[in-house]
Amino acid sequence: MSCRLLLYVSLCLVETALMNTKITQSPRYLILGRANKSLECEQHLGHNAMYWYKQSAEKPPELMFLYNLKQLIRNETVPSRFIPECPDSSKLLLHISAVDPEDSAVYFCASSHGENTEVFFGKGTTLTVV
C-alpha cells in the first residue's frame, strides 16, 4: 500500500512540475532604477483566462489583472502605471512605466480554463527597484 501511495505522490509531483514548465515568465529577476519595463508570460495549456498577481514582501498575492477570453477585468486599486496587454490567448504582458521602489515585489502570471477553475502559476518575476 505504501508503494502505491509513494507512486501516486510522485506522479502528482511530476504532473505539477510539467504544468509549471507550460507557463513561462521572463525575465526571472530584474533590478533597475526608475525606468519603463515589460514583463512577459506565455502559457501552453490552452487556457482561456490569464492573470497577473503582485506579491509584496510579507503580504499575500494580490490580483492585478485578469483576461478571460481576452476581456480585461482590472483591479481598480492598481496604479495606472501598470498596463496589461494580451496580444493573443496564450501571451500576457505587463508594462510598467516609471517604476517606483514600492513596485518591488514578485509578479506572478497564472492561467486557467476560466474564472472558477484550477489556476496554474508561473515561477514569478522578482522586481527590485533601487
Swiss-Prot record:
CDD domains: IgV_TCR_beta (cd05899)
Signal peptide (UniProt feature, chain positions): 1-21
Keyword Signal belongs to the record: yes
UniProt xrefs under SUPFAM superfamilies: Immunoglobulin
Region feature V segment, mapped onto this chain: 22-112
GO cellular component terms attached to this protein's record: plasma membrane; T cell receptor complex
Glycosylation sites: N36, N75
UniProt entry tagged with the keyword Transmembrane helix: no
GO biological process: adaptive immune response; cell surface receptor signaling pathway
Record key words, sorted: Adaptive immunity, Glycoprotein, Immunity, Immunoglobulin domain, Receptor, Signal, T cell receptor
Region (D segment): 113-115
Record's protein name: T-cell receptor beta chain V region A20.2.25
